[in-house]
């Protein structure tokens, strides 16, 4: 497992973003805040990212918005993004195929 440092606006010095690279897929934790004023990466939440989404947490809309948002930010197809766990929770484990841990780190740095 590879741990990458994170330097977001809400970064906490006691945590580092934990990114796992296994079998061609990168996975990390995302904390989703639905019904926000805009879609954005806010910063770090424990060992993952905190993402605000405008979509409500109803009828899978927040999950679909998270798929689109991450695919857009990482420039991958929607099929490359998968919620590995936490589909009905605000804290999710996301798996993305076709990206490197370094690319995920770049995403965090430029949020």
Please place each PLM-identified region on the residue numbering.
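Contiguous, often N-terminal, cationic amphipathic patches that form binding interfaces
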Residues: 2-67, 73-78, 82-111
């Amino acid at each position: 497992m590879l741990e990458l440092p994170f330097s977001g606006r809400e970064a906490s010095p006691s945590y580092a973003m934990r990114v796992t690279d296994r079998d061609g897929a990168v996975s990390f934790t995302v904390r989703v805040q639905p019904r926000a004023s805009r879609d954005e990466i806010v910063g770090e939440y424990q060992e993952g990212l905190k993402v605000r989404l405008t979509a409500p947490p109803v009828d899978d809309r927040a999950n679909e918005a998270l798929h689109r948002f991450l695919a857009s930010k990482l420039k991958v197809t929607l099929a490359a993004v998968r919620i590995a766990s936490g589909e009905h929770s605000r804290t999710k484990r996301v798996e993305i195929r076709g990206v490197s841990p370094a690319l995920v780190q770049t995403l965090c740095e430029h949020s």
